[in-house]
């Protein structure tokens, strides 16, 4: 079974959030009055594995495990192993803040994890504390170093924020020049009730222009391996690359191939939409089997919207959707 929407996009990528908990409090991810999902509402690992099994049967070939911070959930390493053992054919990726996992890197390598996306918005310790509310920069840098030493490919994701990390672009480029990483900037997307979005927005085009004033950035031709949303640039004389992801200024809705399932079992077909489809109650109803889940997933996929239409309708002080990013799963 192949998942296809009403405008002909094939969906083959699932982002599965295993928790909304995180050991950081990033300014763009949660607000002071943020409330966690109650524990009984969080999917059990066996329920998540059932969803992965279903996804694989529906031609999902790429799976990304996210949070919150996925490694903050007890038993996550065992869950990774179960997924890898059950579906060695799936391209498994993990997104993490990198603060908890330096000691786990050898085991991650052993069980077959070959790549990680690590969130890092700044290389400055004081700015890190300002952005995340915690003092863990050295832990993240140690994790990146350990991954590279172990042969795990690393993509570093930084949310581009004017007035926060725009002054560090040259430092980030140097970081990528010195290390074999993809250093990717993602345009800031206001979520939930964020009202500071316009003042923080730093466009991908502005980043590229600023970066080219510092170093020669050479466009990387798109290939089957490089078919994601990032525009990639090699750095002259460098080991790594610079990437730009522009969901706001230059959307990639026409080629979007992904679904999201939150840690409480809500299926979301578009990051810019608040429409959800409940899977948890079906999972926990003994009278409903996998066919009921397939039906919901297939019908939701058919109605997958073109998100930029929704983005165009928002006012400058509104988030792209009403839900906090930590609840959706970045």
From Swiss-Prot:
Q: One GO biological process from the UniProt record? A: Mo-molybdopterin cofactor biosynthetic process
* InterPro entries, alphabetized: Aldolase_TIM (IPR013785), Elp3/MiaA/NifB-like_rSAM (IPR006638), MoaA (IPR013483), MoaA_NifB_PqqE_Fe-S-bd_CS (IPR000385), MoaA_twitch (IPR010505), MoCo_biosynth_MoaA/MoaC (IPR050105), rSAM (IPR007197)
**Coiled-coil regions listed:** none
Could you tell me which PROSITE patterns the record lists for this protein? MOAA_NIFB_PQQE, RADICAL_SAM
Q: In which pathway does it act?
A: Cofactor biosynthesis; molybdopterin biosynthesis
Q: What class of enzyme is it?
A: lyase
Tell me the cofactor note. Answer: Binds 2 [4Fe-4S] clusters. Binds 1 [4Fe-4S] cluster coordinated with 3 cysteines and an exchangeable S-adenosyl-L-methionine and 1 [4Fe-4S] cluster coordinated with 3 cysteines and the GTP-derived substrate.
> Which Pfam family, giving just one, matches this sequence?
Fer4_12
Q: Name one GO molecular function term.
A: 4 iron, 4 sulfur cluster binding
Keywords in alphabetical order, please.
4Fe-4S, GTP-binding, Iron, Iron-sulfur, Lyase, Metal-binding, Molybdenum cofactor biosynthesis, Nucleotide-binding, S-adenosyl-L-methionine
Kindly list the positions annotated as binding GTP. Answer: 15, 64, 95, 155, 258-260
Query: What is this protein for, i.e. what is its function?
Result: Catalyzes the cyclization of GTP to (8S)-3',8-cyclo-7,8-dihydroguanosine 5'-triphosphate.
Query: HAMAP family recorded for this chain?
Result: MoaA_B
The name this protein goes by in its record: GTP 3',8-cyclase
Q: Which organism is it from?
A: Maridesulfovibrio salexigens (strain ATCC 14822 / DSM 2638 / NCIMB 8403 / VKM B-1763)
Its organism's taxonomic lineage begins at: Bacteria, Pseudomonadati, Thermodesulfobacteriota, Desulfovibrionia, Desulfovibrionales
């Amino acid at each position: 079974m192949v998942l296809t929407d009403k405008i002909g996009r094939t969906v083959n990528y699932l982002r599965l959030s295993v928790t909304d908990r995180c050991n950081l409090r990033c300014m763009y991810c949660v607000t002071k009055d943020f409330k966690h999902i109650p524990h009984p509402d969080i999917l059990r690992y066996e329920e998540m594995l059932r969803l992965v099994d279903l996804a694989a049967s529906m031609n999902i070939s790429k799976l990304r495990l996210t949070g919150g911070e996925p490694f903050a959930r007890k038993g996550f390493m065992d869950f990774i192993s179960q997924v890898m053992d059950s579906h060695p054919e799936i391209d498994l990726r993990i997104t993490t803040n990198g603060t908890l996992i330096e000691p786990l890197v050898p085991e991650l390598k052993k069980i077959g994890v070959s790549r990680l996306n690590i969130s890092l918005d700044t290389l400055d310790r004081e700015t890190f504390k300002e952005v995340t509310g915690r003092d863990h920069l050295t832990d993240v840098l140690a994790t990146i170093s350990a991954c590279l030493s172990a042969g795990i490919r690393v993509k570093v994701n930084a949310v581009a924020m004017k007035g926060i990390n725009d002054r560090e672009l040259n430092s980030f480029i140097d970081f990528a020049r010195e290390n074999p990483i993809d250093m990717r900037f993602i345009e800031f997307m206001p979520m939930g009730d964020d009202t500071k979005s316009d003042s923080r927005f730093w466009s991908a085009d502005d980043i590229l222009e600023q970066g080219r004033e510092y170093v020669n950035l050479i466009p990387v031709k798109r290939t089957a391996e490089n078919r994601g949303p990032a525009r990639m640039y090699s750095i002259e004389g460098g080991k790594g690359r610079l990437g730009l992801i522009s969901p706001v200024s230059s959307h990639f809705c026409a080629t979007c191939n992904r679904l999201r399932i939150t840690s409480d079992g809500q299926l979301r077909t578009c990051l810019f939409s608040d429409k959800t489809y409940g899977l948890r109650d079906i999972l926990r109803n003994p009278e409903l089997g996998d066919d009921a889940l397939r039906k919901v997933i297939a019908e939701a996929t058919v109605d997958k919207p073109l998100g930029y239409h929704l983005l165009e309708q928002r006012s400058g002080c509104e988030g792209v959707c009403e839900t906090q990013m930590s609840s959706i799963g970045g």
